[in-house]
Amino acid sequence: MSLLAIGINHNTASVELREKVAFGPEKLSLALNQLSTSSHVKGGVILSTCNRTEIYCDVRSASKNKVIEWLSQFHQVSLDELKPSLYVHEEQAAIRHLMRVACGLDSLVLGEPQILGQVKQAYAEARENHAVNPATEKLFQKAFSVAKRVRTETEIGGSAVSVAYAACTLAKHIFESLADATVLLVGAGETIELVAKHLAGHHCKRMIVANRTRERALSLAQQFGADVIALNEIPDYLAQADIVISSTASPLPIIGKGMVESALKARRHQPMLLVDIAVPRDIEPQVGKLNDAYLYSVDDLQSIVDSNIEQRKVEAIQAEAIVSEESATFMSWMRSLQAVDSIRDYRKQANEAREELLNKSLQALAAGGDPEKLLIELSNKLTNKLIHTPTRALQTAAEQGEPAKLAVIRQSLGLDDLN
């Protein structure tokens, strides 16, 4: 078992690079199949969100560069472009990183709970595609239990802070009151649902949900009293929106500069706030150059969320201590597995020797042998059989002048306790 975690996130890579290496739903099954059937990988999970793309896998020795090369080739991104933003964690560092991610300690918004759901979804998709092996299974199950422990023992998730919350906070900063604002939500996934929940608390005048799948949009709209439109109807409704918040899995922008320009003319250039929290981006970056259009991307939210992080930093110290403890414990368990086969083989060898000598003694006893003599003979032969290999190892280490090896063997045999 050799654990590896590689990836990029909002701290190391720009939105542009994160867009290039994002695994959309249409690519994920193929990627998991390629990864798990590679001769270098025993099992793996791919986590791809707006803020990070990460690969967690159980690899064969000296295979980390092969996984990095695969990521580069799969997305047709050169290693020269990828490597400066790439982080690589191995063994306990990989374990610790996944636990930190699952606990929200590595998120754009410290302690945000949504990432745990995303990690669980990534794990479920890997299982569905038969990409998970026993090592990654154990790793992710442990990460989930650690995240639960952190939520139980700390208050890191005590306040509603998330990218979705930050988007709503931005809207509140720009529009003093949302009571007169019409909000267009593009997408109907988990992030948009969180945005809708936050907005509902501010009683905005009207909420419109635009989504590719009408059924999902209707489900969301019914919760919050919103109207529903199709994505291709956005140009007809955009002028009515004071605030646009978008988060879809579309590989191409949904809202372009020309569309917004037309909407602003129809609005007589009343200001419009557009918040794009999708990766790849849903709104063309050129929209930000238009007068009266205020465009913010995921990266722009960083400055907003900073003010919400302070209250969680103290709790994060305790959470980090839990992660350090749990990652060390898991690493110790992993190391103990390396001895399992050896212990099993050693026990088998000792039992076979015992059974062989015992059977011979029982046969001799049945033939009328002296029980006392046979018992002494059995104990002597069993002792000699069991100490033969360790004795040879001690002799060889001494003859070859290897005091360190000799000391290890003595310690293993418990001889140091006799002095």
Curated annotation (Swiss-Prot):
Under InterPro entries, the record lists: 4pyrrol_synth_GluRdtase, 4pyrrol_synth_GluRdtase_dimer, 4pyrrol_synth_GluRdtase_N, GluRdtase_CS, GluRdtase_dimer_dom_sf, GluRdtase_N_sf, NAD(P)-bd_dom_sf, Shikm_DH/Glu-tRNA_Rdtase
Active site per UniProt: 50
List the PROSITE patterns hit by this protein, alphabetically. Answer: GLUTR
The catalytic activity, as recorded, is: (S)-4-amino-5-oxopentanoate + tRNA(Glu) + NADP(+) = L-glutamyl-tRNA(Glu) + NADPH + H(+)
Tell me which residues are marked as the site Important for activity.
97
Give the record's keywords alphabetically. Answer: NADP, Oxidoreductase, Porphyrin biosynthesis
- The EC designation for this entry is 1.2.1.70
Family to which this protein belongs? Belongs to the glutamyl-tRNA reductase family.
Q: What is this protein called?
A: Glutamyl-tRNA reductase
Q: Which organism is it from?
A: Vibrio cholerae serotype O1 (strain ATCC 39315 / El Tor Inaba N16961)
